[in-house]
Amino acid sequence: MRAVQYRTIGSEPEVVEVPTPDPGPGQVRLRVSAAGLCHSDSFVMGLPEEQYVYGLPLTLGHEGAGVVDALGEGVTGVEVGEPMAVYGPWGCGLCHACAKGAENYCPRAAELGIAPPGLGAPGALAEYMIVDDVRHLVPLGDLDPVATVSLTDAGLTPYHAIVSSLDALPAGSTAVVIGAGGLGHVASRSCGRSPAPPSSRWT
């Protein structure tokens, strides 16, 4: 299969041929329909060698969506052919942080060798990717993977900020989004669906 990999510190990413991965026990293989690019991809490739911790070569892409293509042993709850988005923060799934839905704060991920897609594990800038657990798949139903893939990160970030602030935003209050770039636009639209109407300040 083809994949976009960062292969040498300081170099441009390359489109290369790599073996198509097989899902192991508990894993799901996704045929990628869409992958998003993020500032984090640029950040990772801009790190100097002494700060780079992700391993090489690295298949990029932590925003991914596609169709379930193959199931590893013991996988239940999903079917081959189902369209899914990939939830990017991966943790152990067992600790207090993971139980609260905060897998990005999992204290055991590093010691267990768990890394998010595109930020350690092979990511979505490939024809196929492995998702380590079905809990990291979000059913898309009739939604278009291309139209929704950026919600897995660029949408999730402002959504989390808004949901975390709802106690301070009673009905009739006003939310101000400062910096209405890509994530700011998502925040404004998300605020419009929350109890507080949006007000944007362009900076």
Where are the model-predicted features located?
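Conserved hydrophobic helix-helix packing surfaces used for dimerization/oligomerization
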Residues: 3, 174-175, 199
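Short Gly/Pro-enriched turn/cap motifs at secondary-structure boundaries
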Residues: 19-20, 55-61, 116-121, 128
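Glycine-rich beta-strand-centered segment in the early N-terminal region that forms part
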Residues: 21-35, 49-99, 141-143
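Cytochrome P450 core scaffold surrounding the K-helix E-X-X-R motif
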Residues: 40-46
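NAD(P)H dinucleotide-binding glycine-rich loop of Rossmann-like/cofactor-binding domains
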Residues: 94-178
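N-terminal Rossmann-fold NAD(P) dinucleotide-binding loop
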Residues: 184-185
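Conserved S-adenosyl-L-methionine
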Residues: 193-198
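Conserved acidic E/D residue at the C-terminus of a beta-strand in Rossmann-like folds
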Residues: 203
